[in-house]
Amino acid sequence: MKNINLKIADITQEDVCAVVNAANSSLLGGGGVDGAIHRAGGEQILSECKKLRTSLYPNGLPTGEAVATTAGEMRAKYVIHTVGPVYSSCKNRCEELLANCYINSLKTASELKCHSISFPAISTGIYGYPKYEAAQVAYKSVKSFLETDESMEINFVFSSKESYDIFADAIKEL
């Protein structure tokens, strides 16, 4: 699909309107993509996340929801934080929760008047979601969104060739 791109790159260096952070529910940073985005964006991201925790999400951001902050010192304008499902504990709701991450991130980007967004492979790291299945959920979700908003340019950004190849193979099957 013309609006969907796959690439191997550093997501913190993306020159897009919004970068999606595969966050943990605390919104306070962590490992993997979450830690990299917090480090690259600097104190502004953490400061806004702390405000969100005290105002809107005292118990943390729920799985599948999305919320935006500044991107701080990164090239992007916004970071959209979303919490993916932990595969071992999401039971029969894994696909729905992961799809919600993508759909709600895209809705948030659209509300912010963004026309470009970069996603990591949400939940495929420490959260253990099988990459091939996650790729199919991601692709179906963004494809569905593009049926209502053709103006969005969507990037899937991977830190490894292995992840890139798995996602590329998975979406060929759809």
Region spans (language model):
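Macrodomain-like recognition of ADP-ribose-binding/processing modules
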Residues: 1-174
